[in-house]
């Protein structure tokens, strides 16, 4: 489960495996 404050698309620490996380990351990018 991805925490909101852990959502990131960094190559080193990725937390975008969940669909919601992906959408959030895409929105940020």
Curated annotation (Swiss-Prot):
Subcellular location as annotated: Secreted
Residue positions where Leucine amide is found in the record: 29
Keywords of this entry: Amidation, Disulfide bond, Ion channel impairing toxin, Knottin, Neurotoxin, Potassium channel impairing toxin, Secreted, Toxin, Voltage-gated potassium channel impairing toxin, Voltage-gated sodium channel impairing toxin
A GO cellular component annotation in the UniProt record: extracellular region
Tissue and organ distribution: Expressed by the venom gland.
Keyword Secreted listed: yes
Coiled-coil regions listed in the entry: none
GO MF annotations in UniProt: potassium channel regulator activity; sodium channel regulator activity; toxin activity
Function description: Inhibits the voltage-gated sodium channels Nav1.1/SCN1A (IC(50)=360 nM), Nav1.2/SCN2A (IC(50)=600 nM), Nav1.3/SCN3A (IC(50)=1280), Nav1.4/SCN4A (IC(50)=330 nM), Nav1.6/SCN8A (IC(50)=1200 nM), Nav1.7/SCN9A (IC(50)=1-40 nM), and voltage-gated potassium channels Kv11.1/KCNH2 (IC(50)=4.8 uM). Induces analgesia in mammals. This analgesia is mediated by a non-opioid receptor related mechanism.
Miscellaneous comment text of the record: Negative results: does not inhibit sodium channels Nav1.5/SCN5A, and potassium channels Kv1.1/KCNA1, Kv1.4/KCNA4, Kv11.2/KCNH6, Kv11.3/KCNH7 (IC(50)>200 uM).
Entry domain remark: The presence of a 'disulfide through disulfide knot' structurally defines this protein as a knottin.
Name of this chain's protein: Beta-theraphotoxin-Gr1b
Species of provenance: Grammostola rosea (Chilean rose tarantula)
């Amino acid at each position: 489960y991805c925490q909101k404050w852990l959502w990131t698309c960094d190559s080193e620490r990725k937390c975008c495996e969940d669909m919601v996380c992906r959408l959030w990351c895409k929105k940020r990018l």
